């Protein structure tokens, strides 16, 4: 065999080896994830706002549930719920005894006179026979299960330090009242309920987060009678007329001290009004998504201070419903002095925000509770996970 033929054979052999190695390398590349795939796998989820970034996307959230007690923002940021208490597991979906609730039921845990972090053993639909009264230093944590409360709402009356998280509350009725377990002592008489999904009265340090609220007889969330230090965040409001009432009457002067934050919530186009409706107090409404309304989005009377910052308002198509705001109980010369301010809001489909007053000089308490607003055009991303989350232990939520 000549030198020329040997060279051809050597060249062919080297080329064949190179192709085989390249094929094997390709197989390895196919098996090993790309850096982007690895990043996505490690993340498992994306947290889009400051509250969610505090706890979401951590695979050990179920083993470290009470870390959520460090995550509140806004005027309810001092709320820790049952962080320093025991874990109480709801094992029964029954609510057949509202006078002496059985251990293992939600009502039993909610009325204990000690800090508790309440979780759920499995998916549950709990048909409440009466309103669910919750005592101080409690967290009702629905993560890891699909938890629905039906017929009865939650009442927080003269309590402190309560978190309500990841609960779906709907189809709430007016219930007759009677003797109801309301604390660690014997059951006490209670009046007929108002038919609110969540009713907060005379209470402070309250945080309502990642709840889905719909179809109540009265309001979805009512806060009144001197309640303060409240944050309502990451919630989805849907299929209802009146969403959020902050201050129940123009004669309830105790609501002058009320401070409430609404952040990262979605108000769907099936909500008509009160998103929120405010009286007397100081309200920061920040980075919420208003997907049309029937009557108005933000309303009020009795000279409340309302700071609307970085919200997205999409007006309904009807030409006479473009106004975001509704002021009642005063003529224009008076309400034009009320401090209703808009900053970096996004107004779409002809939405109109008629500002009034001037930028208020904030007190130390108000400064301490203010949240940093993101630009309004970021709201779809900030609110994309509003409402109840689907969480599984051992995986990012």
Swiss-Prot record:
Keywords per UniProt: Allergen, Calcium, Disulfide bond, Glycoprotein, Lyase, Metal-binding, Repeat, Signal
Residues making up the signal peptide according to the UniProt record: 1-25
Cited Pfam families: Pectate_lyase_4 (PF00544)
Positions annotated as active site in the UniProt record: 274
SMART domains: Amb_all, PbH1
PANTHER family for the chain: PECTATE LYASE, PECTATE LYASE 18-RELATED
Family: Belongs to the polysaccharide lyase 1 family. Amb a subfamily.
Full protein name: Pectate lyase 4
Lineage: Eukaryota, Viridiplantae, Streptophyta, Embryophyta, Tracheophyta
């Amino acid at each position: 065999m000549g030198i020329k033929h040997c060279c051809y054979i050597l060249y062919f052999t080297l080329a064949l080896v190179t192709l085989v190695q390249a094929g094997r390398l390709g197989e390895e590349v196919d098996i090993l994830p790309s850096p982007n795939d690895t990043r996505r796998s490690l993340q498992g989820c994306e947290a889009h706002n400051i509250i969610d970034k505090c706890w979401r996307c951590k695979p050990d959230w179920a083993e470290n549930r009470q870390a959520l007690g460090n995550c509140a923002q806004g005027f309810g940021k001092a709320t820790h719920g049952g962080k320093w208490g025991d874990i109480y597991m709801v094992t029964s979906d029954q609510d057949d005894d509202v006078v002496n609730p059985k251990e293992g039921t939600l009502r039993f845990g909610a009325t204990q006179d000690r800090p508790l972090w309440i979780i759920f053993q499995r998916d549950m639909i709990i048909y409440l026979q009466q309103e669910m009264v919750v005592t101080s230093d409690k967290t009702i944590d629905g993560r890891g299960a699909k938890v629905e409360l039906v017929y009865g709402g939650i009442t927080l009356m003269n309590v402190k330090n309560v978190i309500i998280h990841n609960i779906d509350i709907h189809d709430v009725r007016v219930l007759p009242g009677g003797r109801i377990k309301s604390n660690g002592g014997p059951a006490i008489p209670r009046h007929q309920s108002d038919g609110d999904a969540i009713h907060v009265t005379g209470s402070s340090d309250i945080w309502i987060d990642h709840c889905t609220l719909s179809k109540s007889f009265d309001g979805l969330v009512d806060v009144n009678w001197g309640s303060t230090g409240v944050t309502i965040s990451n919630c989805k409001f849907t299929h209802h007329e009146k969403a959020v009432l902050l201050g129940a009457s123009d004669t309830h002067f105790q609501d002058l001290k009320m401070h409430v934050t609404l952040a990262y919530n979605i108000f769907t186009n099936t909500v008509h009004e009160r998103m929120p409706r405010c009286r007397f107090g100081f309200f920061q409404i920040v980075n919420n998504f208003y997907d049309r309304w029937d009557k108005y989005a933000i309303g009020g009377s009795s000279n409340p201070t309302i700071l609307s910052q970085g919200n997205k308002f999409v007006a309904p198509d009807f030409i006479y419903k473009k106004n975001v705001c509704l002021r009642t109980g005063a003529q224009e010369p008076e309400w034009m002095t009320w401090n209703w301010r808009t900053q970096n809001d996004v107004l779409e489909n002809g939405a109109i925000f008629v500002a009034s007053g001037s930028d208020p000089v904030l007190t130390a308490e108000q400064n301490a509770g203010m949240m940093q607003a993101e630009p309004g055009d970021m709201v779809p991303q900030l609110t994309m996970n509003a409402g109840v989350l689907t969480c599984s232990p051992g995986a990012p939520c």
